[in-house]
A protein has these predicted regions:
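Short, acidic, metal-binding catalytic loop of nucleotide-sugar glycosyltransferases
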Residues: 34-43
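A conserved acidic beta->alpha catalytic loop
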Residues: 35, 50-60, 106-107
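Short beta-strand/loop segment that forms part of the nucleotide-sugar
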Residues: 44-54, 76-79
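Glycine-rich, basic loop-to-helix element that forms the pyrophosphate-binding segment
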Residues: 78-94
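Short aromatic/hydrophobic "clamp" motif used to bind/position activated sugar donors
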Residues: 99
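Conserved donor NDP-sugar-binding/catalytic core segment of glycosyltransferases
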Residues: 111-140
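A recurrent flexible, glycine/aromatic-enriched loop bordering the glycosyltransferase active site
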Residues: 134, 145-162, 178, 204, ...
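Catalytic donor/gating beta->alpha subdomain of glycosyltransferases that bind UDP-sugars
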Residues: 174-179, 183-234
């Protein structure tokens, strides 16, 4: 049972819209919601875009928590949405000029929102990128992490806090791809030279240990298959092509 009604009403609540896409991850979503009352700063709007086959059930005590702090809780249920499409819906429905983005696979520190919001304000920047650390304790997940994400936190879209007007410059997310739409959007922001602040806090991704090596590799190749369609990934494909070509030439002449 999640106990939200004991949270005091003097919590720091700011005009920020938190956007969370969720698909068939109700337990993970509830785990994320459990964290919110402990945050140093709490958004006054929480938008959950649920694209599961069955509607998620939000605990009554969480609804009471949002009412006690005058937080608007908006649950949008629409099936078969890719993450980019779900985020676009959240952006269009949000009422605030500052947007924060999370997903059900990453969990922030309690100071994440407070720190990012103040970095934007103090640096007069358009946003703060997410910074995600991929946890790995099992041997197979350490090997996979070493070959992919690395052992240090990396820049990610989940965890980003942005001025809403940035989407007038960079556009919205591509809605027709299963993965890679966030990287595509981040590349557009870099192309437009949007002023962003480096984050002080990081998020934790803890799903590597719960999957087998076969599952991790399968998911990785599935995501890269979808990402390969996007323009920003062209450079990656070129690196692979020239690298493989070089190896082929060396093998042929030895």
């Amino acid at each position: 049972m999640i106990v939200f009604n004991k949270i005091k009403a003097h919590k720091m609540v700011e005009d920020i819209s938190l956007i969370i896409p969720s698909r068939d991850a109700e337990e993970r979503l509830l785990q994320l919601l459990r964290c919110i009352p402990n945050w140093k700063m709490i958004p006054n709007e929480i938008i959950i875009i649920d694209s599961s086959d069955n509607k998620i059930s939000i605990p009554k005590d969480f609804e009471s928590f949002t009412k006690n702090l005058n937080i608007q809780l908006l649950i949008i249920h629409e099936t078969n949405l890719y993450p980019g499409h779900a985020r676009n819906i959240g952006i269009s429905k949000s009422k605030n000029s500052i947007l924060a983005f999370l997903d059900t696979s990453t969990f922030p520190t309690n100071k994440w929102l407070y720190s990012g919001f103040n970095l934007m304000k103090n640096n007069n920047s358009m946003g703060v990128w997410g910074n995600t650390y991929y946890q790995a304790k099992a041997f197979h997940s350490k090997i996979f992490r070493a070959c992919t994400f690395g052992a240090k936190p990396i820049k990610t879209f989940p965890g980003s806090i942005l001025n809403k007007s940035i989407f007038n410059i960079c556009g919205l997310f591509i809605e027709s791809v299963r993965a890679g739409e966030d990287g595509d959007w981040m590349s557009r922001a870099e192309l437009q030279k949007i002023k962003m602040s480096p984050p002080n806090e990081f998020l934790s991704y803890d799903e590597l240990d719960s999957s087998s090596l076969k599952q991790l590799i399968k998911k990785w190749f599935r995501n890269y298959k979808h990402t390969a369609k996007l323009p920003f990934f062209r450079a990656h494909k070129d690196y692979y092509y020239y690298g493989i070509s070089l190896v082929a030439v060396l093998v042929a002449y030895n």
